[in-house]
């Protein structure tokens, strides 16, 4: 369930470039998060928000890497959205750990908040 957020405390997004990488898998949940992220960036004054969709959470780090390495259009921040549901095995934990580790390493290496 989405709740309202007070965007008054956010730094201004004016003149900044924001990117959202979102998975298509579990769209029932991810699409709501995507809509809320775009609304929040717009409320903070971001002129545009670039959105890139990928099949699932596993592909998010590859897309984020491509986004931050594009010549001449390095974003100020990248938001990554995906949902991994826990099943009967440890598969979800392995996917989640791998994706978050890859995103952290990318963020540090490229000096871009992800």
Residue ranges of model-derived segments:
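Short, active-site-adjacent cap segments at secondary-structure transitions
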Residues: 28, 59-60, 85-86
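Anion-binding alpha/beta catalytic cores of soluble intermediary-metabolism enzymes, centered on
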Residues: 1-22, 29, 66-69, 107-114
């Amino acid at each position: 369930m989405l709740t309202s957020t007070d965007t008054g405390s956010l730094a201004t997004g004016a003149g900044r470039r924001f990117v959202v990488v979102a998975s298509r898998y579990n769209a029932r949940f991810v699409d709501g998060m995507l809509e809320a992220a775009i609304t929040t960036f717009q409320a903070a004054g971001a002129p545009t928000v670039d959105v890139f969709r990928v099949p699932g959470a596993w592909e998010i780090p590859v897309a984020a890497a491509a986004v931050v390495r594009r010549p001449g259009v390095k974003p100020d921040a990248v938001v990554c959205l995906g949902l991994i549901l826990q099943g009967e095995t440890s598969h979800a934990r392995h996917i989640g750990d791998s994706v978050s580790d890859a995103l952290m390493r990318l963020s540090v290496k490229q000096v871009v908040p992800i």
